[in-house]
Amino acid sequence: MTSTVLVDIRDEVTCPICLELLTEPLSIDCGHSFCQVCIIGNSNNSVFGQGGRSSCPVCRTSYQPGNLRPNRHLAAIVKRLREVALCPGKQLEVIFCALHGEKLQLFCKEDGKLICWLCERSQEHRGHHTFLMEEVAQEYQDMFQESLKKLRREQQEAEKLKALIQEKRESWKSQVEPEKRRIQTEFKQLRSILDREEQRELKKLEVEERKGLSIIEKAEGDLIHQSQSLKDLISDLEHRCQGSTVELLQDVGDVTKRSEFWTLRKPQALPTKLKSLFRAPDLRKMLKVFRELTDVQSYWVDVTLNPQTANLNLVLSKNRRQVRFVGAQLSEPSSLEEHYDCSVLGSQHFSSGKYYWEVDVSKKTAWILGVCSTPVDPMFSFSQYSSKQGAYSRYQPQCGYWVIGLQCKHEYRAYEDSSPSLLLSMTVPPRRIGIFLDCEAGTVSFYNVTNHGLPIYTFSKYYFPSALCPYFNPCSCIVPMTLRRPTS
Protein backbone atom coordinates (compact mmCIF):
# COMPACT_ATOMS: atom_id res chain seq x y z
CA MET A 1 0.00 0.00 0.00
CA THR A 2 1.51 3.39 -1.02
CA SER A 3 2.03 6.29 1.36
CA THR A 4 -0.50 8.39 -0.56
CA VAL A 5 -3.23 5.83 0.01
CA LEU A 6 -2.35 5.56 3.70
CA VAL A 7 -2.53 9.33 4.05
CA ASP A 8 -5.99 9.34 2.48
CA ILE A 9 -7.13 6.62 4.88
CA ARG A 10 -5.70 8.52 7.81
CA ASP A 11 -7.71 11.60 6.78
CA GLU A 12 -10.89 9.51 6.78
CA VAL A 13 -10.29 8.22 10.33
CA THR A 14 -9.17 11.56 11.82
CA CYS A 15 -11.51 13.17 14.38
CA PRO A 16 -12.85 16.51 12.99
CA ILE A 17 -12.74 17.97 16.51
CA CYS A 18 -9.27 17.12 17.90
CA LEU A 19 -7.68 16.36 14.48
CA GLU A 20 -6.11 13.17 15.89
CA LEU A 21 -6.78 9.54 15.00
CA LEU A 22 -10.17 8.46 16.33
CA THR A 23 -10.17 7.09 19.86
CA GLU A 24 -13.15 4.86 20.73
CA PRO A 25 -15.03 6.26 17.70
CA LEU A 26 -18.77 7.01 17.99
CA SER A 27 -21.09 7.76 15.05
CA ILE A 28 -24.10 10.11 15.10
CA ASP A 29 -27.32 10.17 13.05
CA CYS A 30 -25.83 12.02 10.05
CA GLY A 31 -23.02 9.41 9.66
CA HIS A 32 -20.05 11.47 10.87
CA SER A 33 -17.79 9.90 13.50
CA PHE A 34 -15.81 11.43 16.37
CA CYS A 35 -13.72 10.45 19.36
CA GLN A 36 -15.93 9.44 22.28
CA VAL A 37 -14.55 12.20 24.52
CA CYS A 38 -14.83 14.85 21.78
CA ILE A 39 -18.45 14.18 20.73
CA ILE A 40 -19.69 13.87 24.33
CA GLY A 41 -18.08 17.22 25.11
CA ASN A 42 -19.70 18.73 22.02
CA SER A 43 -23.10 17.34 23.05
CA ASN A 44 -22.82 18.95 26.47
CA ASN A 45 -21.78 22.34 25.05
CA SER A 46 -24.15 22.66 22.08
CA VAL A 47 -27.53 21.56 23.40
CA PHE A 48 -30.37 23.65 21.97
CA GLY A 49 -34.18 23.52 21.88
CA GLN A 50 -36.57 21.88 24.29
CA GLY A 51 -35.74 18.34 23.02
CA GLY A 52 -32.16 18.53 24.24
CA ARG A 53 -30.75 18.07 20.72
CA SER A 54 -27.20 18.92 19.62
CA SER A 55 -25.77 19.75 16.20
CA CYS A 56 -23.05 17.92 14.27
CA PRO A 57 -19.78 19.96 14.32
CA VAL A 58 -19.22 19.06 10.63
CA CYS A 59 -22.59 19.41 8.85
CA ARG A 60 -24.66 21.10 11.63
CA THR A 61 -27.38 18.40 11.37
CA SER A 62 -29.18 17.97 14.69
CA TYR A 63 -28.93 14.69 16.59
CA GLN A 64 -29.96 13.17 19.92
CA PRO A 65 -26.96 12.67 22.27
CA GLY A 66 -28.58 9.40 23.33
CA ASN A 67 -28.26 7.99 19.79
CA LEU A 68 -24.43 7.80 19.75
CA ARG A 69 -23.31 4.43 18.26
CA PRO A 70 -19.85 2.77 18.59
CA ASN A 71 -18.18 2.35 15.18
CA ARG A 72 -16.13 -0.85 15.49
CA HIS A 73 -15.16 -0.82 11.80
CA LEU A 74 -13.41 2.55 12.13
CA ALA A 75 -11.84 1.44 15.40
CA ALA A 76 -10.27 -1.54 13.61
CA ILE A 77 -8.89 0.65 10.84
CA VAL A 78 -7.37 3.05 13.38
CA LYS A 79 -5.76 0.14 15.18
CA ARG A 80 -4.09 -1.05 11.96
CA LEU A 81 -2.89 2.46 11.17
CA ARG A 82 -1.32 2.81 14.58
CA GLU A 83 0.52 -0.45 13.99
CA VAL A 84 2.18 0.84 10.84
CA ALA A 85 2.88 4.16 12.65
CA LEU A 86 2.01 6.30 9.67
CA CYS A 87 3.46 9.80 9.96
CA PRO A 88 3.14 11.59 6.58
CA GLY A 89 4.43 14.89 7.94
CA LYS A 90 7.99 13.53 8.04
CA GLN A 91 8.08 12.85 4.32
CA LEU A 92 8.99 16.39 3.25
CA GLU A 93 7.82 17.63 -0.06
CA VAL A 94 10.71 19.19 -1.93
CA ILE A 95 9.95 22.50 -3.67
CA PHE A 96 12.28 24.94 -5.36
CA CYS A 97 12.81 28.69 -5.22
CA ALA A 98 11.08 30.40 -8.12
CA LEU A 99 13.87 33.02 -8.28
CA HIS A 100 17.03 30.87 -7.95
CA GLY A 101 15.85 27.29 -8.63
CA GLU A 102 17.39 26.07 -5.37
CA LYS A 103 15.64 23.97 -2.75
CA LEU A 104 13.56 25.91 -0.20
CA GLN A 105 15.12 24.73 3.06
CA LEU A 106 15.25 27.91 5.17
CA PHE A 107 12.59 30.01 6.91
CA CYS A 108 12.84 33.81 7.25
CA LYS A 109 11.30 35.01 10.53
CA GLU A 110 10.93 38.62 9.43
CA ASP A 111 9.12 37.84 6.15
CA GLY A 112 7.40 34.68 7.40
CA LYS A 113 8.19 32.66 4.28
CA LEU A 114 10.42 29.84 2.98
CA ILE A 115 13.65 30.83 1.17
CA CYS A 116 16.68 29.14 -0.38
CA TRP A 117 20.35 29.60 0.61
CA LEU A 118 20.81 32.18 -2.20
CA CYS A 119 17.83 34.20 -0.97
CA GLU A 120 19.43 34.27 2.48
CA ARG A 121 22.51 35.95 1.03
CA SER A 122 20.53 38.45 -1.03
CA GLN A 123 20.06 42.12 -0.14
CA GLU A 124 16.34 41.50 0.50
CA HIS A 125 16.99 39.14 3.42
CA ARG A 126 20.30 40.52 4.67
CA GLY A 127 20.26 40.84 8.45
CA HIS A 128 17.10 38.73 8.81
CA HIS A 129 16.85 35.82 11.23
CA THR A 130 16.73 32.57 9.24
CA PHE A 131 16.31 29.00 10.46
CA LEU A 132 16.01 25.54 9.02
CA MET A 133 12.40 24.63 8.35
CA GLU A 134 12.50 21.80 10.87
CA GLU A 135 13.67 24.16 13.63
CA VAL A 136 10.59 26.44 13.46
CA ALA A 137 7.92 23.99 12.32
CA GLN A 138 6.95 22.91 15.83
CA GLU A 139 6.74 26.51 17.04
CA TYR A 140 4.17 27.40 14.38
CA GLN A 141 2.42 24.07 14.79
CA ASP A 142 1.86 24.88 18.48
CA MET A 143 0.84 28.44 17.66
CA PHE A 144 -1.75 27.32 15.12
CA GLN A 145 -3.12 24.70 17.48
CA GLU A 146 -3.76 27.43 20.06
CA SER A 147 -5.35 29.59 17.37
CA LEU A 148 -7.56 26.68 16.34
CA LYS A 149 -8.75 26.22 19.91
CA LYS A 150 -9.65 29.89 20.17
CA LEU A 151 -11.34 30.00 16.78
CA ARG A 152 -13.36 26.87 17.47
CA ARG A 153 -14.63 28.48 20.66
CA GLU A 154 -15.60 31.51 18.61
CA GLN A 155 -17.27 29.23 16.07
CA GLN A 156 -19.31 27.52 18.79
CA GLU A 157 -20.38 30.92 20.13
CA ALA A 158 -21.32 32.00 16.61
CA GLU A 159 -23.53 28.92 16.20
CA LYS A 160 -25.24 29.62 19.52
CA LEU A 161 -25.87 33.20 18.42
CA LYS A 162 -27.32 31.96 15.11
CA ALA A 163 -29.74 29.75 17.02
CA LEU A 164 -30.62 32.67 19.32
CA ILE A 165 -31.28 34.97 16.36
CA GLN A 166 -33.56 32.38 14.79
CA GLU A 167 -35.48 32.09 18.06
CA LYS A 168 -35.77 35.88 18.20
CA ARG A 169 -37.10 35.91 14.63
CA GLU A 170 -39.82 33.39 15.47
CA SER A 171 -40.62 35.17 18.72
CA TRP A 172 -40.91 38.49 16.88
CA LYS A 173 -43.25 37.03 14.29
CA SER A 174 -45.32 35.32 16.99
CA GLN A 175 -45.87 38.72 18.62
CA VAL A 176 -46.75 40.50 15.39
CA GLU A 177 -49.24 38.00 13.97
CA PRO A 178 -51.61 37.76 17.01
CA GLU A 179 -51.52 41.54 17.37
CA LYS A 180 -52.45 41.93 13.71
CA ARG A 181 -55.37 39.52 14.09
CA ARG A 182 -56.59 41.30 17.25
CA ILE A 183 -56.57 44.68 15.50
CA GLN A 184 -58.55 43.26 12.59
CA THR A 185 -61.14 41.69 14.93
CA GLU A 186 -61.67 44.95 16.84
CA PHE A 187 -62.10 46.94 13.66
CA LYS A 188 -64.83 44.69 12.26
CA GLN A 189 -67.37 46.38 14.56
CA LEU A 190 -66.41 49.80 13.22
CA ARG A 191 -65.84 48.86 9.58
CA SER A 192 -68.26 51.43 8.15
CA ILE A 193 -66.37 54.44 9.54
CA LEU A 194 -62.99 53.12 10.68
CA ASP A 195 -61.36 51.78 7.50
CA ARG A 196 -58.76 54.52 7.52
CA GLU A 197 -57.98 54.03 11.22
CA GLU A 198 -57.54 50.28 10.74
CA GLN A 199 -55.14 50.77 7.87
CA ARG A 200 -53.20 53.36 9.87
CA GLU A 201 -52.79 51.02 12.85
CA LEU A 202 -51.79 48.09 10.63
CA LYS A 203 -49.36 50.30 8.72
CA LYS A 204 -47.71 51.38 11.96
CA LEU A 205 -47.41 47.77 13.10
CA GLU A 206 -46.02 46.67 9.73
CA VAL A 207 -43.43 49.45 9.81
CA GLU A 208 -42.35 48.31 13.27
CA GLU A 209 -42.32 44.70 12.09
CA ARG A 210 -40.15 45.56 9.10
CA LYS A 211 -37.84 47.60 11.29
CA GLY A 212 -37.48 44.75 13.78
CA LEU A 213 -36.97 42.13 11.07
CA SER A 214 -34.50 44.42 9.32
CA ILE A 215 -32.41 44.60 12.50
CA ILE A 216 -32.58 40.82 12.90
CA GLU A 217 -31.78 40.13 9.25
CA LYS A 218 -28.86 42.54 9.33
CA ALA A 219 -27.47 40.80 12.41
CA GLU A 220 -28.04 37.42 10.79
CA GLY A 221 -26.38 38.47 7.53
CA ASP A 222 -23.37 39.87 9.37
CA LEU A 223 -23.10 36.69 11.41
CA ILE A 224 -23.31 34.51 8.27
CA HIS A 225 -20.55 36.57 6.67
CA GLN A 226 -18.38 36.26 9.78
CA SER A 227 -19.10 32.55 10.03
CA GLN A 228 -18.00 32.00 6.43
CA SER A 229 -14.79 33.96 7.01
CA LEU A 230 -14.21 31.98 10.18
CA LYS A 231 -14.78 28.67 8.40
CA ASP A 232 -12.37 29.68 5.63
CA LEU A 233 -9.70 30.60 8.17
CA ILE A 234 -10.21 27.39 10.13
CA SER A 235 -10.09 25.36 6.91
CA ASP A 236 -6.81 27.07 5.98
CA LEU A 237 -5.29 26.33 9.38
CA GLU A 238 -6.53 22.74 9.37
CA HIS A 239 -5.04 22.22 5.91
CA ARG A 240 -1.71 23.62 7.09
CA CYS A 241 -1.70 21.52 10.26
CA GLN A 242 -2.59 18.33 8.41
CA GLY A 243 -0.27 18.93 5.47
CA SER A 244 3.46 18.97 5.07
CA THR A 245 5.88 21.32 6.77
CA VAL A 246 6.17 23.29 3.55
CA GLU A 247 2.40 23.77 3.43
CA LEU A 248 2.44 24.69 7.11
CA LEU A 249 4.99 27.47 6.70
CA GLN A 250 4.21 28.82 3.23
CA ASP A 251 3.10 32.51 3.52
CA VAL A 252 2.61 32.00 7.25
CA GLY A 253 2.72 35.70 8.13
CA ASP A 254 -0.69 36.62 6.71
CA VAL A 255 -2.55 33.69 8.22
CA THR A 256 -0.84 34.30 11.56
CA LYS A 257 -2.09 37.88 11.70
CA ARG A 258 -5.60 36.87 10.62
CA SER A 259 -5.74 34.21 13.31
CA GLU A 260 -4.43 36.46 16.07
CA PHE A 261 -6.69 39.42 15.34
CA TRP A 262 -9.89 37.61 14.31
CA THR A 263 -12.67 38.39 16.81
CA LEU A 264 -16.38 37.70 16.46
CA ARG A 265 -18.43 40.90 16.18
CA LYS A 266 -21.56 40.33 18.24
CA PRO A 267 -24.85 41.77 16.96
CA GLN A 268 -26.36 44.88 18.48
CA ALA A 269 -29.39 44.66 20.74
CA LEU A 270 -32.14 42.68 19.03
CA PRO A 271 -35.83 43.65 19.38
CA THR A 272 -37.76 41.62 21.95
CA LYS A 273 -41.03 43.48 22.46
CA LEU A 274 -43.22 45.75 20.37
CA LYS A 275 -42.77 49.41 21.29
CA SER A 276 -46.46 50.22 20.99
CA LEU A 277 -49.41 47.88 21.39
CA PHE A 278 -52.90 48.55 20.11
CA ARG A 279 -55.35 49.28 22.94
CA ALA A 280 -58.89 48.02 22.42
CA PRO A 281 -60.54 50.37 24.98
CA ASP A 282 -60.01 53.27 22.58
CA LEU A 283 -62.01 51.43 19.94
CA ARG A 284 -64.80 50.66 22.38
CA LYS A 285 -65.03 54.36 23.18
CA MET A 286 -65.17 55.17 19.48
CA LEU A 287 -67.82 52.50 19.00
CA LYS A 288 -69.89 54.12 21.75
CA VAL A 289 -69.55 57.52 20.06
CA PHE A 290 -70.47 56.01 16.71
CA ARG A 291 -73.56 54.36 18.16
CA GLU A 292 -74.59 57.64 19.79
CA LEU A 293 -74.26 59.45 16.46
CA THR A 294 -76.16 56.66 14.70
CA ASP A 295 -78.95 56.96 17.27
CA VAL A 296 -79.39 60.72 16.88
CA GLN A 297 -79.12 60.50 13.09
CA SER A 298 -82.27 58.37 13.13
CA TYR A 299 -84.09 61.67 13.89
CA TRP A 300 -82.66 63.44 10.83
CA VAL A 301 -85.10 65.99 9.37
CA ASP A 302 -84.87 67.84 6.07
CA VAL A 303 -84.18 71.40 7.23
CA THR A 304 -84.24 74.22 4.67
CA LEU A 305 -83.54 77.95 4.96
CA ASN A 306 -86.28 80.56 5.31
CA PRO A 307 -85.52 83.38 2.81
CA GLN A 308 -87.88 85.76 4.65
CA THR A 309 -85.51 85.76 7.64
CA ALA A 310 -82.30 86.31 5.63
CA ASN A 311 -80.51 89.66 5.67
CA LEU A 312 -79.71 91.47 2.42
CA ASN A 313 -76.00 90.69 2.93
CA LEU A 314 -76.79 86.99 2.46
CA VAL A 315 -77.55 85.02 -0.70
CA LEU A 316 -79.47 81.73 -0.57
CA SER A 317 -79.31 78.97 -3.17
CA LYS A 318 -82.41 78.04 -5.17
CA ASN A 319 -82.91 74.83 -3.20
CA ARG A 320 -82.61 76.88 0.04
CA ARG A 321 -79.87 74.62 1.40
CA GLN A 322 -76.91 76.98 1.08
CA VAL A 323 -76.25 80.48 2.40
CA ARG A 324 -73.36 82.75 1.50
CA PHE A 325 -72.21 86.14 2.79
CA VAL A 326 -71.83 88.72 -0.02
CA GLY A 327 -71.44 91.97 1.95
CA ALA A 328 -68.22 93.79 2.76
CA GLN A 329 -65.75 91.24 4.15
CA LEU A 330 -64.18 92.08 7.51
CA SER A 331 -60.55 91.04 7.83
CA GLU A 332 -60.30 91.13 11.63
CA PRO A 333 -63.73 90.98 13.32
CA SER A 334 -63.23 92.19 16.87
CA SER A 335 -66.53 90.95 18.26
CA LEU A 336 -69.81 89.29 17.41
CA GLU A 337 -71.25 92.79 16.96
CA GLU A 338 -69.80 92.75 13.45
CA HIS A 339 -71.94 89.70 12.55
CA TYR A 340 -75.32 91.02 13.77
CA ASP A 341 -76.90 91.08 10.30
CA CYS A 342 -75.56 87.77 8.93
CA SER A 343 -78.13 85.28 10.25
CA VAL A 344 -80.88 83.25 8.62
CA LEU A 345 -83.35 80.86 10.25
CA GLY A 346 -84.61 77.47 9.22
CA SER A 347 -88.10 77.12 7.77
CA GLN A 348 -89.09 74.53 10.40
CA HIS A 349 -90.30 75.20 13.94
CA PHE A 350 -89.89 72.60 16.70
CA SER A 351 -91.86 72.57 19.96
CA SER A 352 -91.79 68.85 20.87
CA GLY A 353 -89.95 65.70 19.85
CA LYS A 354 -86.38 65.00 18.68
CA TYR A 355 -84.69 66.44 15.59
CA TYR A 356 -81.28 66.19 13.92
CA TRP A 357 -79.68 68.02 10.99
CA GLU A 358 -76.17 68.50 9.60
CA VAL A 359 -74.34 71.54 8.27
CA ASP A 360 -71.23 71.60 6.08
CA VAL A 361 -68.83 74.35 7.21
CA SER A 362 -65.78 73.21 5.21
CA LYS A 363 -63.10 75.92 4.74
CA LYS A 364 -65.06 78.54 6.67
CA THR A 365 -63.10 80.74 9.06
CA ALA A 366 -66.13 81.90 11.08
CA TRP A 367 -69.69 80.67 11.71
CA ILE A 368 -72.41 80.33 14.36
CA LEU A 369 -74.86 77.40 14.51
CA GLY A 370 -77.61 76.14 16.79
CA VAL A 371 -81.23 77.03 17.62
CA CYS A 372 -83.06 80.14 18.79
CA SER A 373 -86.42 80.56 20.48
CA THR A 374 -87.58 83.79 18.87
CA PRO A 375 -87.35 85.15 15.33
CA VAL A 376 -84.23 87.22 14.79
CA ASP A 377 -84.80 90.74 13.49
CA PRO A 378 -82.28 91.22 10.65
CA MET A 379 -82.28 94.97 11.31
CA PHE A 380 -81.51 94.44 14.99
CA SER A 381 -78.79 96.84 16.14
CA PHE A 382 -76.05 96.02 18.60
CA SER A 383 -75.70 99.66 19.55
CA GLN A 384 -77.41 98.93 22.87
CA TYR A 385 -74.33 96.85 23.82
CA SER A 386 -71.44 99.10 24.74
CA SER A 387 -68.79 96.38 24.92
CA LYS A 388 -67.62 93.20 23.23
CA GLN A 389 -68.88 91.24 26.22
CA GLY A 390 -72.28 92.83 25.71
CA ALA A 391 -72.32 91.69 22.08
CA TYR A 392 -71.48 88.16 23.12
CA SER A 393 -74.21 88.20 25.75
CA ARG A 394 -76.87 88.24 23.04
CA TYR A 395 -75.89 84.66 22.06
CA GLN A 396 -76.78 83.13 25.41
CA PRO A 397 -79.59 80.77 26.47
CA GLN A 398 -81.12 83.50 28.63
CA CYS A 399 -81.61 85.51 25.43
CA GLY A 400 -83.06 82.51 23.58
CA TYR A 401 -79.89 81.27 21.80
CA TRP A 402 -78.30 77.82 22.16
CA VAL A 403 -75.37 78.11 19.75
CA ILE A 404 -71.68 77.37 19.25
CA GLY A 405 -69.33 79.13 16.83
CA LEU A 406 -65.94 79.50 15.20
CA GLN A 407 -64.16 82.84 15.57
CA CYS A 408 -60.75 84.08 14.40
CA LYS A 409 -60.23 80.92 12.28
CA HIS A 410 -59.21 78.66 15.18
CA GLU A 411 -61.31 79.54 18.27
CA TYR A 412 -64.32 77.29 18.83
CA ARG A 413 -66.72 78.58 21.50
CA ALA A 414 -69.98 77.69 23.22
CA TYR A 415 -72.10 80.61 24.45
CA GLU A 416 -73.38 79.78 27.93
CA ASP A 417 -75.11 82.01 30.50
CA SER A 418 -72.28 81.53 33.01
CA SER A 419 -69.63 83.00 30.75
CA PRO A 420 -69.47 85.29 27.71
CA SER A 421 -68.12 82.28 25.80
CA LEU A 422 -66.66 78.90 26.68
CA LEU A 423 -63.54 77.91 24.70
CA LEU A 424 -63.87 74.43 23.16
CA SER A 425 -61.03 72.02 22.38
CA MET A 426 -61.04 70.44 18.90
CA THR A 427 -58.47 67.75 18.08
CA VAL A 428 -59.93 67.48 14.56
CA PRO A 429 -61.39 70.70 13.05
CA PRO A 430 -64.99 69.94 12.04
CA ARG A 431 -66.00 70.18 8.39
CA ARG A 432 -69.46 68.77 9.09
CA ILE A 433 -71.43 69.52 12.27
CA GLY A 434 -74.45 67.62 13.48
CA ILE A 435 -77.10 69.39 15.66
CA PHE A 436 -79.50 67.31 17.78
CA LEU A 437 -82.49 68.89 19.54
CA ASP A 438 -84.45 67.00 22.22
CA CYS A 439 -87.33 69.26 23.23
CA GLU A 440 -88.60 67.08 26.10
CA ALA A 441 -85.12 66.59 27.62
CA GLY A 442 -84.26 70.28 27.16
CA THR A 443 -80.96 69.54 25.40
CA VAL A 444 -79.18 70.81 22.29
CA SER A 445 -76.14 68.70 21.32
CA PHE A 446 -73.45 69.31 18.72
CA TYR A 447 -71.36 66.56 17.05
CA ASN A 448 -68.15 66.63 15.03
CA VAL A 449 -69.23 64.33 12.18
CA THR A 450 -65.80 64.76 10.60
CA ASN A 451 -64.25 63.05 13.65
CA HIS A 452 -66.65 60.06 13.59
CA GLY A 453 -69.36 61.86 15.55
CA LEU A 454 -67.32 62.88 18.58
CA PRO A 455 -69.49 65.11 20.84
CA ILE A 456 -68.52 68.79 20.75
CA TYR A 457 -70.81 70.33 23.36
CA THR A 458 -74.29 69.91 24.89
CA PHE A 459 -76.64 72.52 26.36
CA SER A 460 -78.60 70.46 28.88
CA LYS A 461 -81.63 70.69 31.22
CA TYR A 462 -83.15 73.81 29.70
CA TYR A 463 -86.81 74.73 29.55
CA PHE A 464 -87.80 75.91 26.09
CA PRO A 465 -90.69 78.36 26.54
CA SER A 466 -91.64 78.51 22.85
CA ALA A 467 -91.00 76.85 19.51
CA LEU A 468 -87.38 76.71 18.36
CA CYS A 469 -85.91 77.44 14.93
CA PRO A 470 -82.59 76.22 13.46
CA TYR A 471 -80.17 79.15 13.48
CA PHE A 472 -77.42 79.77 10.88
CA ASN A 473 -74.89 82.60 10.78
CA PRO A 474 -72.14 82.46 8.11
CA CYS A 475 -70.60 85.62 9.64
CA SER A 476 -68.48 87.74 7.31
CA CYS A 477 -66.76 84.71 5.75
CA ILE A 478 -67.66 84.44 2.05
CA VAL A 479 -67.29 80.64 2.01
CA PRO A 480 -70.83 79.16 1.85
CA MET A 481 -72.56 77.20 4.61
CA THR A 482 -74.55 74.19 3.34
CA LEU A 483 -77.33 72.06 4.84
CA ARG A 484 -76.92 68.36 4.06
CA ARG A 485 -79.79 66.15 2.94
CA PRO A 486 -80.83 63.29 5.26
CA THR A 487 -79.08 60.00 4.45
CA SER A 488 -81.10 56.84 3.97
UniProtKB/Swiss-Prot annotation:
GO molecular function, one term: identical protein binding
UniProt-listed Pfam families: PRY, SPRY, zf-B_box, zf-RING_UBOX
Zn finger (B box-type) location: 92-133
Main location class: cytoplasm
InterPro entries linked: B30.2/SPRY, B30.2/SPRY_sf, Butyrophylin_SPRY, ConA-like_dom_sf, PRY, PRY/SPRY_TRIM6, SPRY_dom, TRIM/RBCC
Substrates-to-products reaction catalysed: S-ubiquitinyl-[E2 ubiquitin-conjugating enzyme]-L-cysteine + [acceptor protein]-L-lysine = [E2 ubiquitin-conjugating enzyme]-L-cysteine + N(6)-ubiquitinyl-[acceptor protein]-L-lysine
Zn finger region (RING-type): 15-60
Name of this protein: Tripartite motif-containing protein 6
Organism of this sequence: Mus musculus
